[in-house]
Regions:
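AMP-binding/adenylate-forming catalytic core of the ANL superfamily
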Residues: 85, 102, 295, 348, ...
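Conserved pre-ATP/AMP-binding loop-to-beta segment of ANL
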Residues: 15, 137-156, 163, 186-192
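ANL superfamily adenylate-forming
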Residues: 107-148, 497, 501
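Conserved AMP-binding A3 loop
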Residues: 26-30, 152-176
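Conserved beta-loop-beta connector loops within the AMP-binding
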Residues: 326-345, 364, 382-383, 445-449, ...
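Conserved AMP-binding/adenylate-forming
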Residues: 25, 41-88, 402
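Conserved AMP-binding/adenylation subdomain of ANL enzymes
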Residues: 175-192, 200-239, 253-255
Length: 507
């Protein structure tokens, strides 16, 4: 089953609008069929065969959507790459994935050509060698038959835990997750999704493209997140998907109010934790509750707060239909009762086929009964909602006690003047790890380290309280808004290092 064949609106409603840009450019579903056929024929002309990888590092444009669909139709494996990656980083991905063709921006073509044999270009305006070749091709293409277990895409993990791993996603993985979300979030052909996300990531690509494609919905397609453009277009939208940073920035604009978003039926947040404070502020400003969900590169979406029913701030909702989720002891795999923190494990048709060229790593990440070990810590409450506590790697063990960073962060974030915080463990000569808070605070608040430590004395047990508080203007984030705690740990690794003792002469 080729995923493209499940996107029935492309053939069933060719005159319906699929995509509109702020500049007024429009693509219908019929344009998708014709354009993706041209691009598929172009890929075949470049030597792409079923199962070949096509690496894509280009700026967002309507042509990228056509290229993605063309890869599906040609039976190729789509491999999107973050546009921020340097040539040095690209060398790893290209060397690992061995793509048949690399599609890149013309500005980096010369460098990429030193890494790959077949390189074609596509710029932010949708122009370049690939689009020129596609323009010469026929508007008909026989979509290649694929089995559900065949690979549709490889997405490399963000690398926050070390070397990036290529998550292999099948046609069945992507089709099942899109179908589940269409039902869970009540998508229909009447919807208009405001799309301001990048499309090299699972959120912007497989959630915010596949779901509307499967429902026959339309997109307001922005090249990137721009608050002015979003606020201007929100009255025309029925759904918006974003990362927490989007919502935080929109809340800073006085134009945001209930009247502006009266036509929007759903705001979705993901890719990074949404602060409960942001959830509450958004509801106060707009009268609507953001729907937070939980997913990852390897699985697509696993849980979602309900479309109908309470959307609980600080949770990511119950497991989606067809997804089995349990909380376990990380060492033994023993299932834990509700309310206890442990490792989140999931199983379902959404779960990936494994890591590209890493069979040992793949085997290590799955239990014998097929559950995938996510690496995320959390708990199930009595209502069946999942609470994410943090990454397992972020757990701090200080003096033999376990400290969950999110618990400490929530207390710090609640302090007046604090914008946000990240709590990390750093090597400590006495405790093993020292709890350390990195805080972004409002300049006018005049917060001091001693004041924060004093305020936390009545809020947290002594072993949970930070040994130090460090102030920064902004927390480092990756392209999807996740705080890069690994970078903070590397930067401050020597904070508690004991000064070298002067050597005493013998005698």
């Amino acid at each position: 089953m080729n995923l493209y064949s499940a996107l029935r609106a492309i053939t069933d409603t060719p005159d319906a609008t699929f995509l509109r840009t702020p500049q007024g450019r429009t693509l219908t579903y019929g344009d998708l069929a014709a354009g993706s056929a041209r691009f598929a024929n172009a890929l075949v002309a470049l030597g792409v065969r079923p199962g070949d990888r096509v690496a894509v590092q280009v700026e967002k444009s309507p042509e990228v959507a056509l290229l993605y669909l063309a890869c599906l139709r040609a039976g190729a494996v789509y491999l999107p790459l973050n546009t921020a990656y340097t040539l040095n980083e690209l060398a790893y991905f290209i060397g690992d994935a061995q793509p048949r063709v690399v599609v890149c921006d013309p500005k980096v073509e010369a460098g990429v050509a030193t890494l790959a044999d077949a390189v074609v270009t596509l710029d932010a305006a949708g122009q370049g060698g690939l689009s020129d070749l596609a323009a010469k091709q026929a508007e008909a293409f026989d979509t290649v038959a694929r089995d559900g277990a065949d690979l549709a895409a490889i997405l490399y993990t963000s690398g926050t835990t070390g070397r990036s791993k290529g998550a292999m996603l099948t046609h069945a993985n992507l089709a099942s997750n899109a179908s589940t979300l269409v039902k869970a979030w009540r998508f229909s052909a009447a919807d208009v999704l405001l799309h301001a996300l990048p499309i090299f990531h699972i959120h912007g690509l497989f959630v915010a493209l596949n779901v509307p494609l499967m429902a026959g919905a339309a997109l307001l397609y922005l090249p990137k997140f721009d608050p002015d453009a979003v606020l201007r277009l929100l009255p025309e939208a029925t759904v918006m998907m974003g990362v927490p940073t989007f919502y935080v920035r929109l809340l800073q604009d006085a134009r945001l109010d209930a009247a502006l978003v009266k036509g929007v039926r759903l705001f979705v947040s993901g890719s990074a934790p949404l602060l409960a404070e942001t959830h509450q502020q958004w509801a106060a400003a707009t009268g609507q509750a953001i729907l937070e969900r939980y997913g990852m590169t390897e699985t697509g979406m696993n849980t979602s707060n309900p479309y109908e029913g309470p959307r609980v701030a600080g949770t990511v909702g119950p497991p989606l239909p067809d997804v089995s989720l349990r909380i376990t002891d990380a060492d033994t795999g023993r299932a834990l009762p509700r309310g206890e923190i442990g490792m989140i494990e999931v199983k379902g048709p959404n779960v990936f086929a494994g890591y590209w060229r890493m069979p040992e790593k793949t085997a290590a990440e799955f239990r014998a009964d097929g559950y995938f070990i996510t690496g995320d810590l959390g708990l199930l409450d009595n209502d069946g909602y999942v609470h994410i506590v943090g990454r397992g790697k972020d757990l701090i063990i200080t003096g033999g006690f376990n400290v969950y960073p999110k618990e400490v962060e929530e207390e710090i974030d609640a302090l007046p003047g604090v914008i946000e915080s990240a709590v990390i463990g750093l090597p400590h000569p006495d405790l093993g790890e020292g709890v350390t808070a990195v805080v972004a605070a409002a300049a006018e608040a005049g917060l001091k380290e001693a004041a924060i430590l004093r305020l936390l004395t009545t809020r947290l047990a002594g072993f949970k309280r930070p040994k130090r508080v460090l102030f920064v203007d902004d927390l480092p984030r990756n392209a999807m808004g996740k705080v890069q705690k690994a970078a903070l740990r590397d930067l401050h690794a020597g904070l508690y290092a004991a000064p070298a003792s002067p050597r005493k002469d013998a005698g």
